[in-house]
Each structure stands twice: as structure tokens, then as C-alpha cells.
Amino acid sequence: MAQYFGFIPSDKLNDMINEAERIINSNEQVDYYPYRNELTQQIARELIDNLLVGLIDVIPNPERQAAMGKIVNTIERTTETLLNVLLGKDKNEDIIPSFEFLKNESMFLDNDGERRVGFKLSDRAAQTINEGYAAVTPDNVDLVKFKAALETMNEVALTHFITRFTETLKLGMIKRGSIPVAKAGIDKGMSLALNKLLPQLPDAGLNRLAGFYRPFFIEKAE
């Protein structure tokens, strides 16, 4: 069995994926870069929506909800700015590696045959995440293990969708050098969100949080 992380794309994102596949597979004589750029931006938006926006509803205090909302907005703006800088008007042959990465390494079918946007987890990451969620029960919560699971989830998602994806882009030294800086900023924002959120929640709230995230993790036969 293999462990995967993935979210169910919106109808809009599904349509964008299907359209990009159709254009590539039919060798349609159009510029590919607008499809790559729009698809990448939409995946980023939905990834943030699934991982972070839902957290706001878990917070019981309205003032803290507002503070969390500001953190999430900062992450959204940073991500959008990074992608606007990196995604340019590339030649079609330079777009293909990005499409192949998104299609072959960033999507999978879950056990119900439904498309998800995500990726296979390493054994080590899967173990940390599984142990963290198993440590959250109605009777007891091991906050250290649960926090480690959430941090691992964020790190592997950032590594896949920022570090590995941008390796498929044809970039100059300056643009490529901006990627680790932007990734560190996004990672800092996500860590800040967790550090603000977790101490506020009683065990019941931590169980709700774990319940919110569990559906993103899929175990399926290889």
C-alpha cells in the first residue's frame, strides 16, 4: 500500500486540467504557456484554500479568526506574486516538462476513482503523518506528534508544488534564486498559522482539526 496526499479539485480546475490535456495530446497549434500559467495559479489557490482557509472556521475566537485570516491572505499574496514572476511566455517545448510533472506526478485517482490533485508521500513522511493523526483521539491528544504531522504535511506540499514544480521551469539565475526565499516566506507564514492556532484549541477542537485534514490522506494499492 502507498500513502498519498491530495485534494479533490473544483469543477473549474477539473475543466482546466481536461482542456490542457486535450490541447497537448492533440498537438494543437496554439501557445501552451497561458494554459500552464492559469492551471498552476488555480492549483495554488485551491491548495491554499484546502490547507489553510478551512482552518479559520476551526478557531473559536472571532478576533483570532481575523488574525488567522490576515496570515492566510499574506500567504496567498506571496504565492501569487511568486508565480507571476516565474511563469512567463515560454516556448511550447519548454512548457511540456511542467505539464508532464502536473499530469504524472501531481494527480492521481483515489479509491473511488475520483481525480485528486496531490502526490505520493515518502514512507518517512507518511509514517510521521499517520502517527500524528493517530495521536489525536477523543480521549487523548499528543500535541507534539500532531504538530509534527501538520508541519510535515505543509513541508512536503511546499516541496512538491514549489521546489519540484519550479525545477521544470526554464528560468534564469535571478528568478531561480528567488524561489528558496519565497518558499521560506510561505513556510514561515504556515508555521506562524499553526503556532497561533494549536495552543488556542481544546482537545475537542484539535479533534475537529484532525478530522478536517484526515480526508486529504489516501491509502491505496500501488
Residue ranges and their predicted role:
Residues 1-222:
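Protein-protein interaction and targeting regions used for scaffolding, dimerization, and localization
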